[in-house]
Amino acid sequence: MATTKLVYILLILFTFTVSPAISTAPEHCDSGFDNPCINKAKALPLKIVAIVAILTTSLIGVTSPLFSRYISFLRPDGNGFMIVKCFSSGIILGTGFMHVLPDSFEMLSSKCLSDNPWHKFPFAGFVAMMSGLVTLAIDSITTSLYTGKNSVGPVPDEEYGIDQEKAIHMVGHNHSHGHGVVLATKDDGQLLRYQVIAMVLEVGILFHSVVIGLSLGATNDSCTIKGLIIALCFHHLFEGIGLGGCILQADFTNVKKFLMAFFFTGTTPCGIFLGIALSSIYRDNSPTALITIGLLNACSAGMLIYMALVDLLATEFMGSMLQGSIKLQIKCFTAALLGCAVMSVVAVWA
């Protein structure tokens, strides 16, 4: 997974360094210079406020689940934690459908792009679809590699007296018999799934966090920034809760927990700093910006939608905890709907 994350980061850095002359903007493209809200002097202090506010709310969001072990209502094995996790999963699903994917469609269908090929093919939907499939492949192959790396194949029940359905067999060293077999319960397999889910989810979130930060930092529209600050704070708070819950269940080492929380917390502010540095040469209606950010948004949307539906919501709703209680299912479904509703309301401003 570290290699996969590195590939994604390199891809992002590469796309932002592509030559600004990918294509030429049509003559009828609105430059936006007549907008009275365009004021660089007023926009800069607002961007600084945005950096501090988003940094703070992101930190609160992603770290709050990590301290839930000390709150009886929110312990990982309790109903309260499950309800909060489903709410956060709804937030992530709403982010993909109501924020990232619509932005991608809007950018890649802009009148600032040439008709051929951007208006003749739904690139946003196609890239989101392929991103979801690639995420599925990464999810599946990574799990297989990690599981297969430690598997030695089936062992007869009569030899070990253990139900194979409840154990996977891992190579170990037995001091009494030379090379022996160590058996791990299903909990180990579930822990591996949680770790894969947390890491893939973080990659998807980092994708669109970079885009959000760059766009906010590069714009000089003070009216837009004012509305975005509050909306993005709510967005990062709840998204952080969702990611933090996944990190908690993955039971990473403290160092890995810190690094994942650090990257989530700092990515958007770093994107804003980068946008500020590029604001003098960056035009959000240029073909290069529209194509690059539009494609990155589509890719991020596919990943977030897949993770929310398949690895988060479906996994929990098909699990033994929710399957054993219709009442808890209803509560969790309501929480997921509420999460989607919150992001739908936030979409009015962001």
UniProtKB/Swiss-Prot annotation:
Transmembrane stretches, by residue range? 48-68, 81-101, 121-141, 196-216, 228-248, 258-278, 290-310, 330-350
Say yes or no: keyword tRNA-binding present: no
Give the CC-aspect GO terms: plasma membrane
Which residue stretches are annotated as topological domain Cytoplasmic?
A: 69-80, 142-195, 249-257, 311-329
Where is the secretion signal located? Answer: 1-21
What are the recorded Gene Ontology BP terms? Answer: iron ion transport
One GO molecular-function annotation for this sequence?
Answer: zinc ion transmembrane transporter activity
Q: Which InterPro entries does this UniProt record tie to the protein? A: ZIP, Zn/Fe_permease_fun/pln
Q: In the UniProt record, does the keyword Signal occur?
A: yes
Q: Which UniProt keywords apply?
A: Cell membrane, Ion transport, Iron, Iron transport, Membrane, Signal, Transmembrane, Transmembrane helix, Transport
The membrane topology term of the UniProt record is: Multi-pass membrane protein
Q: What induces it?
A: In roots by iron starvation.
Which cell locations does it reside in? Cell membrane
Q: Which domain of life is it from?
A: Eukaryota
Chain ranges sitting on the Extracellular side read 22-47, 102-120, 217-227, 279-289
According to its UniProt record, in which tissues is this protein expressed?
Answer: Expressed in the external cell layers of the root subapical zone.
Query: What exactly does this protein do?
Result: High-affinity iron transporter that mediates under iron-deficiency the iron uptake from the rhizosphere across the plasma membrane in the root epidermal layer. Could also be capable of transporting zinc ions.
**Family listed:** Belongs to the ZIP transporter (TC 2.A.5) family.
In terms of PANTHER family, this protein maps to: FE(2+) TRANSPORT PROTEIN 2, ZINC/IRON TRANSPORTER
- The protein's name in its UniProt record: Fe(2+) transport protein 2
Q: What is the lineage of its organism?
A: Eukaryota, Viridiplantae, Streptophyta, Embryophyta, Tracheophyta
Name of the coding gene: IRT2
